Amino acid sequence: MPKLILASTSPWRRALLEKLQISFECAAPEVDETPRSDESPRQLVLRLAQEKAQSLASCYPDHLIIGSDQVCVLDGEITGKPLTEENARLQLRKASGNIVTFYTGLALFNSANGHLQTEVEPFDVHFRHLSEAEIDNYVRKEHPLHCAGSFKSEGFGITLFERLEGRDPNTLVGLPLIALCQMLRREGKNPLMG
């Protein structure tokens, strides 16, 4: 049975994969994440997830390698990590009363036989109308400077939302586990069977 590799250094993705109670290792993929001018958000996350998984194949020749990538889209534009408090406030002002869509690309690459499975999972976050004071308090309390969209849904960010829509809530954090379990079963690795 091939071993499992998570092509990511994200502590959030690692924590999500640990929910499946299967043995895995993490490795950092070497991928240029620059978007191409002709790529849609869906195409971007699909390409990057695939490249991340395949980039580790030579180092891990008989493994199942998981690649994942996510973008946050508001008004048709990709919204990155804010990095500063002012940018976080600006992103939250734009999101207030709107729908933010997260696209998460997932790839599972079997480096032993070259079989690749891919999927893109959308997830919609419906923001309630936020006051300036709420935005300021949220940024001060949660400090979401390294989170796309300027919030942490698994934390205090839940207070910003009116509704969440998607097949798998794990998608919003960065790794669609329902889709991943389906892919793993197709490769003969059922998380419920060890």
Curated annotation (Swiss-Prot):
Localization terms from the record: Cytoplasm
Catalytic activity: N(7)-methyl-GTP + H2O = N(7)-methyl-GMP + diphosphate + H(+)
Similarity remark: Belongs to the Maf family. YceF subfamily.
Gene Ontology CC annotation, any one: cytoplasm
PANTHER family recorded: 7-METHYL-GTP PYROPHOSPHATASE, BIFUNCTIONAL DTTP/UTP PYROPHOSPHATASE/METHYLTRANSFERASE PROTEIN-RELATED
EC number: 3.6.1.-
Function: Nucleoside triphosphate pyrophosphatase that hydrolyzes 7-methyl-GTP (m(7)GTP). May have a dual role in cell division arrest and in preventing the incorporation of modified nucleotides into cellular nucleic acids.
Pfam families: Maf
Site (Important for substrate specificity): 12, 70, 154
Active site: 69 (proton acceptor)
Protein name: 7-methyl-GTP pyrophosphatase
Single Gene Ontology MF annotation: nucleoside triphosphate diphosphatase activity
Originating gene: yceF
Obligatory cofactor(s): a divalent metal cation
